[in-house]
Amino acid sequence: MVDSQAVKNTCLASRQSKGFCFYKATNGIKRHLAVDSSGFPLFTYCSKANISDDVGLIEMFKQNLDYFRDKALDMPKTTILLDNGYHPERIRKELEEFYPEIMDKIQFELSPKPSKQEKLAQGKTGFVPVKARWVVERSNAWVERCKSLVKNFERTNANAKLKLCFIRLLIKRLASF
């Protein structure tokens, strides 16, 4: 599952890390996150907030291309769930340009968005996570628990603090067993 999260900048953040996301009306950075079915991170990528979700996903995959190259062709395809902010055809075309065999190893699937009638029937309003996508939304919520990641304090778009947050989370989960 893949998702992005726009995060506001503080006054300490540099101009190089700033961007404005019109969709979420946020001046800052965007964290792109790919998680497994348990919500643990596979890949992370930070960009300016004005970078589209598609471009962020493509860059995240480019940085982790060895993961896909090492995957055997006789293994089942990995299904990547996307929300409606992504355009699978555009992503597929761009990924095939720099690694043509990648579509033999992965497939994209758009998560169906619940209609207003479905929300009303369930008695819910506002943001309702789509079935199976709540896992990546929960992972974004876990990131919000790390105080240094609530806002962007950094001068660069580095992933280090995001990865440290997930390492801490994984250690806590393993220690509880």
Give the location of each predicted region:
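Tryptophan-centered motif/residue detector
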Residues: 5, 41-42, 134, 142, ...
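Helix-centered, glycine/charged polyanion-binding patches within enzymatic domains
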Residues: 69-158
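Aromatic-acidic/polar surface patches that form glycan- and anion
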Residues: 50, 157-160
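Polybasic low-complexity intrinsically disordered regions
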Residues: 1-98, 104, 111-113, 165
